[in-house]
From Swiss-Prot:
Binding positions (Ca(2+) 2): 129, 306-308
Domain note: Consists of two alpha-helical lobes, each of which contains one c-type heme.
Organism phylogeny: Bacteria, Pseudomonadati, Planctomycetota, Candidatus Brocadiia, Candidatus Brocadiales
Protein name: Hydrazine synthase subunit gamma
Keyword Heme: yes
Catalytic activity: hydrazine + 3 Fe(III)-[cytochrome c] + H2O = nitric oxide + 3 Fe(II)-[cytochrome c] + NH4(+) + 2 H(+)
Binding site for Ca(2+) 3: 139, 141, 296
Pathway the protein acts in: Nitrogen metabolism
Organism: Kuenenia stuttgartiensis
Occurrences of domain Cytochrome c (ranges): 209-353
Length: 353
């Protein structure tokens, strides 16, 4: 099944709306005729492959990059649409007072600043780590909580992107919603972002000796990494995720109640008094991520470049994700019995993915 976005007739863009600088930036000079951009008969400018309602794969089925997940077929405008999406991704004009763009957080073509944000969309105090979105089209859902499923939910008026980045002064302060064309172009650009590949392997792509030792630890059933992150490091299509949500001990509401080190919550009275609004520790959960214990299993591809880690950015380094200093003991892999050198070898293997 394919959904086609067409421009033409009543939907075509008039030349008076398009600024010369934007046209030049998009590389679409020459596509403009006397009637408008893409004037004349409707033309297919994007074809997105869709299917039945997306369902998480079973753990016995390693998740891999689909052979054909997204493609623009028989379209002379693919590159222009992606480049227009890149313009939108880096353009702050659509936000309130031009304060920031997508690239402000997902900089350098979809990578992450590693910063943690409290955007207030799920209750003050719901810290969220900036997600690494390269290769994101291969691995829904698109939020830490796993609330969105099908890859194409990210497209459309009720999509996760339009909802998460919607016309809401409590989130990214966008002054208006994206038009269908702008949203489609943005999605095409995001879908075009591929994994970078690890620079930590040998020159021929093979694993170093430390990485080989780390692989044995990673695949050891006693450690359990493969239970949630299945994949072969020599398979370029492997994603190292079971596409499920799990409780790895990072939620504030733990198995036996509150965690021993609950986070700081927003205090409006302190803010009004000119004090640090997050200066007070509290055992009282609030709406949003504080009431969630299970979070989406991320891909381990490009994991070296996607820190900080966990949904709240609680782990600054890869070592912090496995040495039981951030999450509850042995809830994120069973690593408490490993020696320091074994932990370091495991980190080296992760950096190779």
């Amino acid at each position: 099944m394919a959904r086609e976005m067409r421009l033409g007739g009543k939907e075509r863009m008039k030349t008076g709306v398009v600024k010369i600088g934007l046209v030049a930036a998009l590389g679409v000079v020459g596509l403009i005729s006397a009637g408008g951009v893409y004037a004349g008969q409707p033309r297919v400018i994007s074809t997105i492959q869709t299917g039945a309602t997306w369902e998480p794969l079973g753990r016995e089925e390693p998740l891999t990059v689909p052979e054909v997940h997204f493609r623009v077929k028989h379209s002379p405008f693919k590159s222009e649409l992606v480049r227009y999406g890149q313009f939108q991704f880096n353009d702050a004009a659509w936000s309130l007072q031009g304060s920031y763009s997508c690239a402000s957080c997902h900089y350098e073509r979809g990578q992450t600043t590693g910063l943690i944000w409290d955007l207030g969309d799920e209750g003050w105090g719901s810290w969220k780590n900036t997600k690494y979105i390269r290769g994101g089209r291969y691995l829904p859902p698109f939020r830490h909580e796993g609330f969105t499923g099908h890859p194409d939910e990210i497209v459309g008026a009720t999509s996760s992107l339009d909802r998460v980045c919607g016309r809401d002064p409590g989130f990214v302060f966008r002054s208006e919603n994206f038009s269908p064309m702008r949203l489609e172009a943005l999605i095409c650009y995001i879908r075009a972002l591929e994994f970078t590949g690890s620079p930590f392997r040998n020159a021929d792509g093979s694993l170093t000796e430390a990485q080989k030792r780390g692989q044995k630890i990673f695949e050891d059933p006693k450690v359990g990494c493969l239970e949630c992150h299945p994949g072969d490091p020599m398979d370029p299509r492997a994603l190292f995720s079971d596409a499920q949500t799990h409780d790895v001990g990072t939620g504030r509401v733990g198995v036996n109640g509150f965690r021993s080190t609950p986070g700081k919550v927003f205090n409006i009275s302190a803010l009004e008094a000119g004090e640090d609004p997050y200066g007070v520790e509290s055992n009282t959960p609030i709406i949003g991520l504080d009431l969630v214990k299970e979070f989406d299993t991320p891909t381990l591809r490009d994991i070296y470049a996607s820190g900080t880690y966990f949904h709240d950015g609680g782990a600054r380094t890869l070592m912090d994700t496995i040495n039981n200093t951030v999450n509850d003991k042995d809830m994120h892999g069973r690593t408490s019995h490993l020696k320091q050198q074994e932990l370091q070898d495991l980190v080296e293997y992760l950096k190779a993915l």
